[in-house]
From Swiss-Prot:
It comes from Thermoanaerobacter sp. (strain X514). SUPFAM superfamilies: Ribosomal protein S2 (SSF52313). Coiled coil: none annotated. CDD domains: RPS2. GO terms for biological process: translation. GO terms for cellular component: cytosolic small ribosomal subunit. Belongs to the universal ribosomal protein uS2 family. PROSITE patterns: RIBOSOMAL_S2_1. This is Small ribosomal subunit protein uS2. HAMAP family: Ribosomal_uS2_B (MF_00291_B). The keyword Ribonucleoprotein applies. One of its GO terms (molecular function) is structural constituent of ribosome. The gene is rpsB. Gene3D superfamilies: Glucose-6-phosphate isomerase like protein, domain 1, Helix hairpin bin. Keywords: Ribonucleoprotein, Ribosomal protein.
Length: 235
């Protein structure tokens, strides 16, 4: 039973690439044809590549690994958050803060600050502070929550990244590569697939296409986690 059907991919518009003038020649092997100035992605390869990515993610989750879901473009923000939360993983869906991976210690410090502010709000500290200061602290908390909320409980570097539009998330790609963290990504016709360990050729601009593929990656995590629980109960 394959992970995804051609019908699902077609209905979600996964086959629509970018305009032909905005392309990366390295994506040529994944292009089926050109129609009305737009490249059409070869969905047979999408099926194959998604299956490879699915197996990789499932095995990783089975071994207790973690995945960081990354997608900050408007079309990806909701899917990234929803699917990462559904499978109990971490996400970045606002702005990628430079150093999120390569300077993780500093990022952990900012997360610690977020936790402190949350605690202050909960234990009544805010009630006894001057109103002006509380407004300032609440603003700081909201800002930290916005950018770091999705990685608040990420204790160490992730085992892998799942990225929507690696061209837009070039900093995340560079950081993961420098730390040799494997990358799974949806690569559209304007991306460089050679930078990605598990490229999934597909439309990274349509909400439905992004949601479909992101949900399959989350499914792989869930399936892998069930395998991990099963293995633990067998011991």
């Amino acid at each position: 039973m394959s992970v995804i059907s051609m019908k699902q991919l077609l209905e979600a518009g996964v086959h629509f690439g970018h305009q032909t003038r905005r392309w990366n020649p390295k994506m040529a092997p994944y292009i089926f044809t050109e129609r009305n100035g737009i490249y059409i992605i070869d969905l047979q390869q999408t099926v194959e590549k998604l299956e490879q990515a699915y197996e990789f993610v499932k095995k990783l989750a089975m071994e207790g690994g973690t995945i960081l879901f990354v997608g900050t473009k408007k079309q990806a923000q909701d899917s990234i958050k929803e699917e990462a939360e559904r499978c109990g993983m971490f996400y970045v869906n606002q702005r990628w803060l430079g150093g999120t991976l390569t300077n993780f210690k500093t990022i952990r410090g900012r997360i610690q600050r977020l936790k402190e502010l949350k605690k202050m709000e909960e234990d009544g500290t805010f009630d006894v502070l001057p109103k002006k200061e509380v407004i300032k602290l609440r603003k700081e908390k909201e800002r930290l929550q916005k950018f770091l909320g999705g990685i608040e409980n990420m204790q160490s570097l992730p085992s892998a990244l799942f990225i929507v539009d690696p061209k837009k998330e070039a900093i995340a790609v560079a950081e993961a590569r420098s730390l040799e963290i494997p990358i799974v990504a949806i690569v559209d016709t304007n991306c460089d697939p050679e930078l990605i360990d598990y490229p999934i050729p597909g439309n990274d601009d349509a909400i439905r296409a992004v949601k479909l593929i992101t949900s399959k990656i989350a499914d792989a995590v869930i399936e892998g986690n069930q395998g991990e629980q099963f293995a633990a109960s067998e011991e």
